[in-house]
Amino acid sequence: MPLSGWPKGGYEVRLWYVHVPERYFIYMAADWNPRHAPINIGYPSRTTMNPSSQLLVQQLAAVLEVDTAELDLNSGFVHNGGNSLSAVEFVSRSKSLGVSLSIASILSSTNLRALFTDLLSSESNLIPIPDPSDDSDDLSNPSSSTGGSPRVATPISSNVSTAAEDDYLTQGSVLTQYATQSLSEMQASLLHGSLKSPGTNIIYHYETYQTDVIPVLKRAWKTVIEGEPIFHSSLLDGSARNQEYFTWSEVTVETEAEYREQLQTLWLKSVSSSFKVVHWKRSPPASSQSTVIWAVHHALVDGYSAMLLFCKVRRAIKGLPIVPGPSFSDVEKRIRVWRQEHKSQGDEYWAGHAAQLDQAQGELLLPAPTPEGTSSAITESEEVYVAPSVSNTQLHCVAKRLGVTLSTCYYAAWSLVLSLYADSASVVFGAVLAGRNLPLEGVDEVVGPLVNTLPLCLTLSRQQSAQDFLKNLFSRMVELAEYQWTTPDNGYTRNFSSAMAMQVPGPECKDGVSPIEPPYTRQTTDVPLSINILTDGAARFVYHTSQYSRADIVRLGKYFQRALQLLLRPHRPIEECLQGLLGCVDLQTLMGFGNCSSSLTTTVAIKEDLVTLFESAVSRNPMDVAVQKGNCHLTYQELDTHAGRVAATLRGYIQDGDVVCLHADRSVNWIVGIMGILKAGGVYCALDKALPQEARETIFSASGSRLFLVPSLSDQSFCPTDCDRLLVVEDLVKDDNVPITHRDSPRPQTDAYLCFTSGSTGKPKGVMCLHQGLVAFQRDLEVRLFAQPGRRVAQIMSVAFDGSIHEIFSALSYGAALVLQSGDDPFAHLSDVDSAILTPSMARVLNPADFERLSTVSTKVYLVGEPVTQDVCDRWSEQKTLYNMYGPTEGTCGATIKQLHPRQRVTIGPPNPSTRIYIMNQHQELVPPGVIGEIYIAGVQVARHYIGMPEQTAQRFVADPIIRIGERMYKTGDRGYWSEDGEVVCLGRTDRQIKLRGFRLDLDDLETRMIRAFPAVTAVALTRQGNHLIAAILPASTDVDAFSARVAQVLPPYATPRKILALDEFPTTKAGKRDYLAIAKLSAQAPVSTGRTLTSPMEKLVGDAFRDILQLGKDVALHTHSSFRELGGHSLLQLLLATRISQGVNRQVPLYVVAQHDRIDHLAAAIDSGLGLQQLVTTDPMGLGESAIAPIEREWWHKYQINESTSSFNVNFMAKIDDCLVDRARLVHACNEVMARHRVLRSRYIFSRAAGRVVRQYSPLAPRVQAVKTVNPWVEVNRPFSLSRSAPIRAVVSDSYFILTISHIVADLTTLQILLREISSHYQGGSLPSIPHTYMNSTLWYEKPTSCDLDFWSDCLGQLPDTTHLLGHGGYRRGYRGRSALCEVPPTTYQSMRHFLRQSSITAQQLSLATIALCLDDPSVPMPTETDIVLGIPYINRKSQEDLDVVGLFLEPLPVRISFGQETHNHEKASYLDTVQRSVRSSVGHAVHWDQLLEHLQVSTTPPDHPLFDVVVTFHSQSHSNGLELSAPGLRTCYTYAEGAKFRLLCEFSALSEDRLLLRLEYDTDCFTEENIQLLQARIPLALSLLVQNVPYDMIRQTLACPPETQPVKVLKPDVVFGTPLSDI
């Protein structure tokens, strides 16, 4: 949008909404007309209007962008093309003319002429007519002050995420009491969002220009920003100390990749405003371009404010005067007074809508994507662009005809889609209002966030026409605008799951400074879904990737466009609009997913019944075993004979279809009885032997049976009292005189068995199932447990459960052997079967390895009845073929089947071949793919009815409305959705989803999350009691306080249980299910725990803070369980609480700590633990402070600038994980806690152009462990760090490895040891000590060197020795590329070395240094007569005990000059080593900081070359190596190193054990050849051997010059050694 060419006047104002977290950023687009252009006021000829009315008409025409002659004054504002945005503008213009009217009156007007007449009838509204000769600004521009009016339209870009690596207002930021109390409600809310979710509520605005206009823009912006009061003080502390009003930085890049990268970098770190210019230098220069990026916190501006500023900038560019706006704090005070005076009206308004808001649904019923690895606290957003399918012209025609605004159509379309996706007739989402319609001075001109977001709640009646709905929606919007000044204190909440924004463009300018690309805006958001409507009708759907998948949002966008199409015919009813949203493509997808095209799901496909199938099996395999119990068995022929005898007798007592109850005792005669009942034409009903007699009596009575069958004479005592006749199978089978008959034709439509299930009230429901359903179900081999001749099927399920039906008839209908339980062990027979059905609870306690036959891969195991957990899936599917089956009894045993595999997500799978499945809403309409609805089962498997329950049967068994062939479907009451690959994901019962205090809660999901958060709890039962949740947990020994504290950290406040009961077992219903009603009663009887009195100093401090912030009287008693929320605290007061406590403890208490610990004892314990809490930093002239970096860090930063993608500066640790011994979750938690407590690990290194130096900034979020399945250790160890954008540390936990990688800029080996020590301690349950001393307040770096030290170094290094004779000297370093070569020092040499070191005062480091100094001569050049060389060693540089426990980089390089030759009188070995030892001791004794040494010697640093020395030598003893370990069982330290070369040559000795010494040569491949390295690998062990054997110095040199033929050194392959446990090398 052009930035100049603005006329002197004639601005018109429009609002444009852009969504941000819980708010909208409202841009004002200003249209303009040439100031002195003649305006044709074409009034209707039959009407005479006074001058005042003419001015209003002129203003109206300007607002609507039409000629006055085109206005129809006999119609309303909307009919003339007005909308809510232009209404705001017209009200503002009228106000400037002295006419007061409301937005509601103008929007609801139906006759403009009458409106104007009424307005101007009052003297108070008479408009002063200007003198025509007056040369002042035209009244067509009511905002023609020197401040100007908003004028630029800025296209919206996608909302973007804020990564933890970016630098923003941190969680540890502390607000002063003054600042907190002086904030407006909106500012406090925005700041609260930033503190709780760092990086949110920051706006980035981009404009791209020709490079040569940037200086003009800079001057204009500087003038404007420095003039506005709101930028003059810090919102964090209310002061202007060290506050830069205007910050401007510039960076120049030469490639497009660098340019794009700079544009993507988000840098704002505080509540401030900042500018950054990215210059892209191109050839030719005229093609260069520059992008100006304005970053500003939303607590400083809203969109209206931004456009006021834009307008002033344009005026400044043209040299026009600029007048600052009024003080925001002054305007805010007036607004507060207004709110107080009108509070009762606001309270009354929202109280009137409270019931509707409570019932409204705003949450899309879409599943969250499955997370990969560990969950992250980072809010990540992506955008989906939805192209328009309906033009604005079409919609405008509809809107004009109905007298509503265009935006009403878009709001209505989203309401339709939201109603479908929320399965609710009442929906709510966010709507924004400018907040500038109050009749208060300064509201129109002030810069500051006056914007407000209100809940828009709508009810969609299906019988209502779309046009009536549009009109009602428009009226609702008008009404809402009248209360845009209200805040949540008036009784509403801003809990929006979605929100919509409209974009309105402005005109283009024809001259002046103009952007060469359309401007755009990026902004952070914590609203899960925002819909931004573009000017052409397209939409941008910006969504949180943690909450929605891209496929779901793409589909959502299509439905939104389809809704707009449906609204083009507004006469149709809302029901038709909702039904029309499901398109043909999705309908076809759903039909395919649901198995709707298969005839196998229909009754016409069934030609057999259970009896004919059994008899066919008998005829084919008469002598095969049919049923076995221990040593007793029956063949198919015997079973058929016995069952035939039972049937012959039964026919004398029953009619076809009569129910016969059978005593189910798991005996062979029980099976005989079942088949006898069916062969007689009866219906089998089991009376479980294990049930109480009262329950058996109830079932018998409900079944309608008059006859009772028992397997044996000993069972007669179980006969129900109402039984008319008792028959004994044991007697019946002995009668060989009865005729044995077989069924002449199948009867699939007849009833087969009656199975009782428990209802929600505990009263059993009898489900009547048909032959055809079970025959259809078991027709598939995989479904029927692979039952066939030769296979053995276990009978293990409860005889009262339809799982036993599946076992029995799968086997007996297809010739398999049914194996019954025998003996005392109910699972013993599993060792002798090929197929078995288990519940997941059984599988959890059983070990497949304990059952010889069951543990084979060919064995098929089916899990039914409960959700399958991942651990059960993994353990069992590794050893056998495992299936998950789902289906209620009413759907005949099973509806879906899914083979499970190790470490793959558990689902219930697609429909089985004989079932149709639908997922429907409450109106029994198909929901779109991926949307959560209720699962329905349709087709041949649907049972007949509930016996004796016609009302419940009518409710649950209904006609199939999808496949209309006269069949029925069953309403399961289970919630689920279709996955992308057509599998059903079952989420639990619908009656476990509730609405509590305005929030929709899934109680099953909450139970799962609680168990996951606190593994010591084995089960959770959650239920509702009034407006609170009650939780019962197992076992009774659980630490309830610890559980409560942990749950409060992972669940939102409204989902946290108010009472928690620890029980030995849950109360159950008669059917054995959890009795939630009984749990609620137990909770009601239990007293509310008030905790104890406050005793510890921290508890008292927190209690005092509670009392102060909440203004509690002395009569309010506080105790350890006192809750901040229950005492009246809310999110905004948490800001002040965090500040108050931080000041009290002199440590930064982040907002998230306060938010996660609501109770006094929990919060006090969290603060006492010290985890993640940093000391409040005070300016210490002797410490680094918050932003300064240490000189050694600066040294490494400069090295990184040579090649930031290098991995050579990575410090790493890796351990191999024993899966049986290591608790990965605990390891991840321990590592996260340790990384979070050291703030230096959040460092970002940023070059500040203003400061002219590199500064440290902090990410608000601590680094987090990445949990992955697999990892490539070499790739992970060598991933480079981006110092400005990412954390300087990362940790990965895979199935096999734990890898910790740190940039050398923040770590040395001591730091690595500290971190590993703390991780080990925390992993094993130890507590971590507080951190009294941090890297940032270390005073070490400001120590001044003594003159004695400096004199030493002048003498030592004043003139450096010649290096032309050394290996590697001739090469030119181009970077930090390099390799590592590894070899083993011969064990005999290492043993001699260890013996020598024990007998002398020489250290291993000194001996190694002496060795390397002798080996570096290049054989191709003449050898010097003496040794004179400078080598480097690592200097720990930790000079105090407290420094030894500080995480950070202290290690510095230290030069050691070794000079020894012919002038030395004693050339013995001891003399040479003594010289080396003295040299090392002297260097260490006179050590000064590296930067001080270089400055003193006046040596410049030119990376990658290293000053003073090129070779570094280090020796890691075995004890040192042991410090680099996680001291916990199952973690084995591996050998690692990073790729590349930090120096020309690094010689690193590592003692792996008492007899293994490894030598790694890290070398620059531009300087050393492979032959050089091979020579060093031969020389170094040889020199070491000679030195420890007392060989004279001269002889050693001669030997190295002409080495003898010796045993070659054992060279190790780097790819073999890397990643190998140290003990295995």
From Swiss-Prot:
Annotated pathway: Mycotoxin biosynthesis
GO CC term, one of those recorded: cytoplasm
InterPro entries per record: AA_adenyl_dom, ACP-like_sf, AMP-bd_C_sf, AMP-binding_CS, AMP-dep_synth/lig_dom, ANL_N_sf, CAT-like_dom_sf, Condensatn
GO biological process, one term: amino acid activation for nonribosomal peptide biosynthetic process
A GO term, aspect molecular function: phosphopantetheine binding
Enzyme Commission number(s) of this protein: 6.3.2.-
Listed CDD domains: C_NRPS-like
Region (Adenylation): 614-997
Residue ranges, annotated region (Condensation 2): 1195-1585
Start and end residues of each stretch annotated as Condensation 1: 286-567
Keywords, sorted A to Z: Ligase, Phosphopantetheine, Phosphoprotein, Repeat
Record PTM O-(pantetheine 4'-phosphoryl)serine, positions in chain: S84, S1131
Domain of life: Eukaryota
Disruption phenotype: Completely abrogates the biosynthesis of aspirochlorine, but also of the intermediate dechloroaspirochlorine.
Ranges where the Carrier domain occurs: 47-123, 1096-1171
Region span, Disordered: 127-157
Gene3D superfamilies to which the protein is assigned, alphabetical: 3.30.300.30, ACP-like (1.10.1200.10), Chloramphenicol acetyltransferase-like domain (3.30.559.10), N-terminal domain of ligase-like (3.40.50.12780), Nonribosomal peptide synthetase, condensation domain (3.30.559.30)
Family assignment from sequence similarity: Belongs to the NRP synthetase family.
UniProt free text on domains: NRP synthetases are composed of discrete domains (adenylation (A), thiolation (T) or peptidyl carrier protein (PCP) and condensation (C) domains) which when grouped together are referred to as a single module. Each module is responsible for the recognition (via the A domain) and incorporation of a single amino acid into the growing peptide product. Thus, an NRP synthetase is generally composed of one or more modules and can terminate in a thioesterase domain (TE) that releases the newly synthesized peptide from the enzyme.
PANTHER family attached to this UniProt entry: NONRIBOSOMAL PEPTIDE SYNTHETASE (PTHR45527), NONRIBOSOMAL PEPTIDE SYNTHETASE 5 (PTHR45527:SF11)
Function statement: Nonribosomal peptide synthetase; part of the gene cluster that mediates the biosynthesis of aspirochlorine (or antibiotic A30641), an unusual halogenated spiro compound with distinctive antifungal properties due to selective inhibition of protein biosynthesis, and which is also active against bacteria, viruses, and murine tumor cells. The non-ribosomal peptide synthetase (NRPS) aclP is responsible the formation of the diketopiperazine (DKP) core from the condensation of 2 phenylalanine residues.
Protein name, per record: Nonribosomal peptide synthetase aclP
Species of the source: Aspergillus oryzae (strain ATCC 42149 / RIB 40) (Yellow koji mold)
Gene: aclP
